[in-house]
Amino acid sequence: HAMIVQEDKEFRKEEIFLMLLGQLLRDNAGETPLPDAYKDESDIGAVCAYLEEHSGEPVSLDQLGEVAGLSKYYLLRSFTKQKGISPYRYLETIRIAKARKLLERNVPMIEVALQTGFADQSHFSRFFKRLIGVTPRQYAEIFGGRQA
């Protein structure tokens, strides 16, 4: 499980590095428009589908670049431009949405953490509270057992 946490951190660090590099290049070399091939929303749609399908697994920018057929730099730039958030942030929203559904079905907290790609319950709880504003336990108490 520690590997998942480590790979998530590496993914986020690489993403931030590439965003900063892109900003430096734009600031010092002028904005270069993306070639038409990079503007195709189906490439980004394929990345979104991949992230949804593999949300409980470690994911890297290299993998996402292969899915889209783009370099990781162009993928990051194009994805962020089209979606308004980075691929990592998009993955986080998928994981939390999945966690919310599982908590509403009264799935045990440790199972929710593992099914949504978190290394342990503690990491999941901190992350969930940061994004949602309540702990997973509080969320489950409020929304758990409701029938749709």
Where are these regions (language model features)?
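ATP/adenylate-binding site constellation spanning eukaryotic-like Ser/Thr protein kinases
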Residues: 18, 96, 133
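Terminal helix-turn-helix DNA-binding modules in bacterial transcription factors
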Residues: 49, 53, 58-62, 70, ...
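Proline-centered helix-kink/hinge sites
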Residues: 87, 135-136
